[in-house]
Each structure stands twice: as structure tokens, then as C-alpha cells.
């Protein structure tokens, strides 16, 4: 039987390793109306991020009880439903507390209406929704992006009444030079004029929200400058020469690194071999095995990147070949050239997933390697069942999360039925413990891609370094990217040197995993 923090009947969760044991955050979200399901999603996204700083409890705001805030060191409310009927006890307790409160999006007007004199207490007043084309949010002097698709939701504008009590800590700028307060802080209350969890990207205002969540979850958070690099999609089909060259370079720059290994390479239909099927066990290719051992000697840590990193003998969605396709999730490419996530694979079950994990671990053993302790799901996609298996089989994941609506009714994760027609991904800039109970090593900067694919633009070292610069707004952010070994090593050198010149020190993934 698998028993994890995600499957016990509670809405209270442990923080990530290194979180502040003296901190405990209450996270509340909206749950009524047509978009009530979205409230749960946003609450879970906030909760995942809060785990870096503290343990937490997450549940619907409607279930708040008087005095509940007294058991916590801070409160986060995510307002996604216009005029959600918030309990009077919640409004009164927020107005009475001196603990840090972060309020996002809707219903701040309920709080101001309940106050005796909101402007006197906090130094600002919530006003009206601004629907101008605000596409930039400046926070800590860094200009972050705001997707045009978010504009139609509006930004709740504030007015500063007393600059000795309140200030705009982030300002949005529209396309004609007008400005709107994006985040306002007065006394112990910080207010963000939207829920910045939709239409996010690597340079998005989401980064500012992450940092503001950290000020509530752990006001004494460390400000380390650490970096991670992962060498991606390494299998028996790779070039030992390229792998050794990468190891030599990284070692010369005092850069520990991770190698994401696919232990069993298959091309079931001979897609890259003139129609002749190929299957290569790691142990069968001594050149790659020796190169991996060489990489270990130069500071490399091997992790498991799926078993075959593909599914059956079908295009899922590309070729059916290892490293190309999804393994634990079905996907197709639509007529607009977007990858569409369909459902978990037909065989999806704990026993099926455990079987693949065990086969993968056996491949490592047969090739003379110790069992990896860290797992990376292929294409960062799996079912809730799979994530529970990964949690039981490894000490951490190294990825971005994929979550489904319905898994966490009232914050009690694992008691609901995941709705795979409503899935959402989330990237993290630092170590978290997500709602599956798993310690998640971050990867948020992406990778070098020389050409556009599936409507994703090319991504060069300069793009990755720009995202890293934007991530500096987040206290304790880990600059984490990955690199495919078939690319010219000059791209890797540019990123490593760029991050080091920014003052970041590369560390092993296992160091970040410890907190």
C-alpha cells in the first residue's frame, strides 16, 4: 500500500526540506460558482509554492472558522470568483490580525467594506478593474511580462491614500505608458490585483507572485544564489564522445551536474533505422556505460528519466522512439500544431507504473550502476497514480508538476477523482514539496531549442539567461536549466558562463534536495 502526504485524509502538509519549522501558512481559495473548480487549482498552485517556506494547510475559504488564523503564522487568500460569499469571520480575522496576509484577485472589496476605515488602517483603497492593455509588470526594478490573454480578466486598481503606510511594490504598464498598481502593500496586508497563475511563462509576472508568497511563508528565507544543470535524454543511442566532452567542460568549470538517463532505448518501428526495429539495453553499449561512469567521476549524478521515454509502438505524439515521446500520458498534435494532452495511458495503474520503474532500475543495475534516487517523468507528464508511485520509489522528482482538478477536494489531496480534462502544469524556482507529497527539485529556465516546434519559439542561451535575470526577483531562486548532448557544446558554455558571471554557484541536485 502506498501512503503519502497526498493520500492521507488531511489538508495539512509538510514543508519542503529546509523550510522554516516555526512557520505555518493557511491558504484559502474560492470554491463556488461556474469556476469553483479553478479556485481549487489556484489554491494548490499557491500551496505548492508556499511549501518552500513553511508547512501549510489549504482549504476552501467558505470553510474558514472564526479564530482559525490564530493557529498560523500567515495567511494567503486566492480570490478567483467574483463576489464569492466569504465568511464574515474570515473578513473580521484578517482585519484584526497583525500577521502577514497576501490577498490575490477578487473580493478585496468585501474586506474594505467590512473595515471601519480600510484606508486609515492600510493606507490604500481598492477601486475598480482596469482593462487597459497592461503587458509589463515591474517588480524590484525588473520588467516582467504579462500575457495579452490575461488582459481581459482585468487588474483591480488601488489608490495609495497614505504613502507612509502603503506603497505600490509592483506596477503594471500599459501599451500607451499608463501605469496601474499591480501589487500594493499596506501594513501587514499585501494585495495583488489579479490571480497571476494563468497564462504564465518563463519571464512572467508569476515570478513576482512567487516572491510575494515567500514573504508570507518564510519572512526569514535565505537568499542563496545556486544553479543546476541537467544533461537530458541520455540513452544507449548517444555519442560517448559528446558525453565525455560535456563532462570535461563542466568539470573544468567546477560545475556538478545531473544526467537524465533513459535506461532502455527502443525504436519499435525503426523510425530512425529504415524500418528495422531497434532495442538497446544500456548494458549492451559499453561505450555509453563507460562514458556515464566517466561523467560520474567528473561530478555527474545519474537520475532515471522514465524506463523507455516512449509508449508502446505508436506515435505518442511523434515517432514512438525513446526520448521523443510521452511514456505515462497519451498526447497528439492537433491541426494547429499544438501538443494536446489527452489522458493517462490505457494501462495506467499502480502495478503497471511500478513495473516500469522496477524494469528501469534493473537496467541500471545490469549496467553496473547503483539505483538512482531521483526521477524525472518523461515530458513532465504522468497521472496522479503515477506520481504516487514515483513518490514511493524515489526520494525526489526533478521536473515541473502536472496536476488535475478534483484531486484535492477542500484541500484533502488524494480523496477526490482527478479530472484529466482539466489539467494544469506548474514550474517552481526552488525546492518544494508538492501535493503528491514529493520533494521536487526545480527546473524553470528550460533548454536550448534551435528551431520553432509545436508553436514554441526557438530558445537560445540569451533567452535562458534573460529568464535567469528575471528569476532574480525571487528570493532563494535556483537557476535551473537542461541541455541536450547532441547540441554544440558552445551553447552550454554560454549558459554556464553567463550564470556564473551573475554570481551563481552550480551545486549538485542532491544538495538542493536537502533544502
Identify the residue ranges that each predicted region occupies.
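Aromatic-Pro/Gly-enriched surface loop or interdomain linker
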Residues: 13-71, 223, 250, 259
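Acidic-and-aromatic substrate-binding clefts and catalytic sites of carbohydrate-active enzymes
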Residues: 34-38, 61-67, 79-86, 109-110, ...
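C-terminal domain-boundary segment and adjacent tail
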Residues: 58, 213-223, 241, 245-268, ...
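A glycine-rich, often tryptophan-bearing local segment used as a flexible ligand/cofactor-contacting loop or short
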Residues: 77, 81-148
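Metal-dependent polysaccharide deacetylase catalytic core of the NodB/CE4 family, i.e.
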Residues: 109, 256, 260-385, 445, ...
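Catalytic beta-strand/loop cores that center a nucleophilic Ser/Cys/Thr
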Residues: 133-188
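Non-catalytic propeptide/linker segments at domain boundaries
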Residues: 173-226
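Catalytic grooves of carbohydrate-active enzymes
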Residues: 226-236, 240, 351-354, 358-374, ...
